[in-house]
Amino acid sequence: MIYILHTPTMSSNTPYATSIVYMWNFKPNERAGIPMACIQQNKQHIPEHTIVTPADIIPILSSFPGLPELWAKIPSHHWVVKADLGRLLYIYKHGGLYLDMDCVIATNPFQQVNPKSDRMILFTEFTVPIDALGPRECKNPRNALRIANYAFAANYKRHPFLEMCIRECMRRLEVLFQSNLDKWAETDILWVCGPDVITTMYHEQASDATETDSSIRLIDRGYLRHLGYGSWRDE
């Protein structure tokens, strides 16, 4: 598959950690208030934060032809798919650090990176047996190492890796819509725009020495604690 990547917009020596991006109100008719416990804990490391809602994502969709139509077709009860895709879009458009609302910074990881060379930060999630992967997920042995989508950062706008991920989400959405499934399984949801996208795209670019993006830094998950509430599974 060929991806046409935009030239990134850089700002020299831009730090990652001036503010944390969280997302809320993607669940239709959300009645719960914004959970502040993790936000307050994370202020010890990064004081500022931004709460992103669907209204912040809509204007970005037109950056990718065909995406507004795909977005509109995502069933409302699968709102987590929009949240998964929305986080990629927002950091692609604006740069910055994304964290799930239930993710706590244990130790500031940005003390270990060089903002001049480590332009995209990803975190390991866990390692699984290949036979534990979902039916649609790539079974290449390298994909046993899963990459988190609950935390990632880019210190410039329009990072090519995020564009690759967004375009892969679009391709996968088209596959699901063309399948005319009566119901999307949990494995479909995790695959279509969830952590399997970042995992697959990371390993694909890292497996070819001629295509490896040296600006991507993979960091151990030990810097974070993901509480993994997974409220979308209750839908």
Predicted regions and their residues:
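Glycosyltransferase-associated regions of secretory-pathway enzymes
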Residues: M1-A83, L99-E235
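Small-residue hinge/turn detector
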Residues: D84-G96
